[in-house]
């Protein structure tokens, strides 16, 4: 069986990652994938470049308001940051392109519990403040409870169950 991925009425499964980004889809992979030898600011600039859109001057300030640690560490190499800080940087990099959809793959992986809760809270705030849709794949039930407005169980690429939030 084969399906397709449709975004705003168009199939996107054959598009390259940078073309998807230019359509307004931001992707934060499992394991974060920051550029370890580049500074926080350089990593954030990559997000703007990938999106193909010039970010307004206040975009950086907005990201720093959601993730203050990035402002404090703006000149630090990303590879020397903790896992939670790198996750915040990866999300910030995606936000530089002002996506309408953010895909997060296992955002809690390898991150201490208090930072997981901070990231969950910030993602909910981002959704409310900017209207960005956040779709995430996650096994951490606490993060799911904190972030989800809908939940689906998948097995081998198929949705097997839809759960109401009171049953999570």
Map each language-model feature to its residues.
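Conserved small/polar residues in nucleotide/adenosyl-binding loops
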Residues: 166-168
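Catalytic Walker B motif of ABC-type/P-loop ATPase nucleotide-binding domains
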Residues: 102-106
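Helical segment within the ABC ATPase nucleotide-binding domain
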Residues: 117-130
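H-loop/switch region of ABC-family ATPase nucleotide-binding domains
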Residues: 138-139
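ABC ATPase C-loop
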Residues: 94-95
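Conserved ABC ATPase signature
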Residues: 77-81
